[in-house]
Amino acid sequence: MSDWESHTVIGQKARAGGSGPRANVARTQGQINAARRQGLVLSVDKKYGTANTKGDAEGQRLTKVDRETDIVKPKKLDANVGKTIARVRTEKKMSQKDLATKINEKPTVINDYEAGRAIPNQQVLGKMERALGVKLRGKAIGEPLGGPKKK
């Protein structure tokens, strides 16, 4: 058990005048069990080291989905997006493996996107857009990707 997982306070709740046993923190399961046998365990609390961590928004979304009563199918990729990916890829004389290597994904991911089986991932779609040079999101699917905006 790591130091950050939990700490147990052993001793009296209030020490008036410094008398009585000192409250201390048990670090091992053996120390906790020994204190429980003596009846000295006051609390077992979790310690969380959250100084540099961020909450996961995906976990919040999954909790919301879990609490809903109706069953919702995950969104699938539109069929014309898959056809556009396949068409542009063949125009550029790239195989699925070449495209997958270019965007650092597995060839099965490209296959799923082209077949329309994939659950849309904005990061993967963005990488495909840049690699193929066409839009795959929004209303203008299949149109050439514009360069950076002029200032």
Curated annotation (Swiss-Prot):
Q: DNA-binding residues per UniProt?
A: 96-115
What PROSITE patterns does the database record attribute to this sequence?
HTH_CROC1
What are the GO cellular component annotations?
cytoplasm; extracellular region; nucleus
RNA-binding as a keyword of this entry, yes or no, is no
What is one Gene Ontology biological process annotated in the Swiss-Prot or TrEMBL record? maintenance of translational fidelity
Question: Which is an annotated GO molecular function term of this record?
Answer: ribosome binding
User: Which SUPFAM superfamilies has this protein been placed in?
Assistant: lambda repressor-like DNA-binding domains
Record-annotated HTH cro/C1-type domain positions: 85-139
Disordered: region residues: 1-31
Q: Which domain of life is it from?
A: Eukaryota
Alphabetized, the UniProt keywords read: Activator, DNA-binding, Transcription, Transcription regulation
Give coiled-coil spans as residue ranges: none
- Any one Pfam family match given in the protein's UniProt record, by short name: MBF1
Q: Which family does it belong to?
A: Belongs to the MBF1 family.
Q: What does this protein do?
A: Transcriptional coactivator that stimulates GCN4-dependent transcriptional activity by bridging the DNA-binding region of GCN4 and TBP (SPT15), thereby recruiting TBP to GCN4-bound promoters. Involved in induction of the ribosome quality control (RQC) pathway; a pathway that degrades nascent peptide chains during problematic translation. Required to prevent stalled ribosomes from frameshifting.
- Official protein name in the record: Multiprotein-bridging factor 1
Provide the taxonomic classification.
Eukaryota, Fungi, Dikarya, Ascomycota, Saccharomycotina
